[in-house]
Curated annotation (Swiss-Prot):
One of its GO terms (biological process) is cytoskeleton-dependent cytokinesis. Inactive when phosphorylated. Phosphorylation levels vary during development. Oocytes contain only the phosphorylated form, and 80-95% of cfl1 protein is phosphorylated in unfertilized eggs. Rapid dephosphorylation occurs within 30 minutes after fertilization. Phosphorylation levels increase again between the morula and blastula stages (5-8 hpf) and then decrease again as gastrulation approaches. Dephosphorylated by pdxp. One of its GO terms (molecular function) is actin filament binding. Keywords: Acetylation, Actin-binding, Cytoplasm, Cytoskeleton, Membrane, Nucleus, Phosphoprotein. The lineage of its organism: Eukaryota, Metazoa, Chordata, Craniata, Vertebrata. This is Cofilin-1-A. Belongs to the actin-binding proteins ADF family. Its main location: nucleus. The gene is cfl1-a. A motif (Nuclear localization signal) lies at residues 30-34. SUPFAM superfamilies: Actin depolymerizing proteins. It is found in: Nucleus matrix; Cytoplasm, Cytoskeleton; Cytoplasm, Cell cortex; Membrane. The keyword Phosphoprotein applies. Expressed diffusely in both animal and vegetal hemispheres of the oocyte. During cleavage, expression accumulates around the cleavage furrow, along the vegetal membrane, and later in the midbody. Strongly expressed in the animal hemisphere during blastula stages, with most cells showing expression by gastrulation. By stage 17, expression is highest in cells of the developing neuroectoderm, and at stage 24 the notochord, neural tube, neural crest, somites and some cells of the archenteron show high expression.
Length: 168
């Protein structure tokens, strides 16, 4: 079911910036986004960047100790969101970095919010081509455990996420 919701040009621009990994100057590399959260505009007609809900690569190690935990804290307890998370992980063979499209639909969100976000998900996904991983999350228990993201990225082959071990 399509909702008729549009995707803002800013969302597409941020996605393209996150998707392309090329040699950046040290200054530009610090400005590269690690995570962003998208929400619906007040009139519920456009998917937009949620103001202030981003993590920059340059923040990591300065005012962001654990990018994954910081990302989790950006998700509202009682409303839906979309997000992009640039996951840095290691498998038994190699280090990898992949974008993950996140659909956050917590149990505490209103039915109306869940319905409009669910029906608009295809609209945003069509505008963000080439994403390898999609993760729908409905509880804080699921999102708080980095092993769940590791499972989405490669199951038992993933040994660390953001430099932290995910397997005991």
């Amino acid at each position: 079911m399509a909702s008729g919701v549009m995707v803002s040009d800013d969302v597409i621009k941020v996605f393209n910036e996150m998707k392309v990994r090329h040699q950046l100057s040290p200054e530009d590399a610090k400005k590269r986004k690690k995570a962003v959260v998208f929400c619906l505009s007040d009139d519920k007609k456009t998917i937009i960047l949620e103001p202030g809900k981003e993590i920059l690569q340059g923040d990591i190690g300065c005012n962001v100790e654990d990018p994954y935990k910081t990302f989790v804290k950006m998700l509202p307890r009682n409303d839906c969101r979309y997000a992009l998370y640039d996951a840095l992980y290691e498998t038994k063979e190699t280090k990898k970095e992949d974008l993950v499209f996140v659909f956050w639909a917590p149990e505490e969100a209103s039915l109306k919010s869940k319905m409009i976000y669910a029906s608009s998900k295809d609209a945003i996904k069509k505008r963000l081509p080439g994403i390898k991983h999609e993760w729908q999350i409905n509880t804080y228990e699921d999102v708080n455990d980095p092993c769940n993201l590791a499972d989405k990225l490669g199951g038992n082959t993933v040994v660390s996420l953001e430099g932290k071990s995910v397997r005991s």
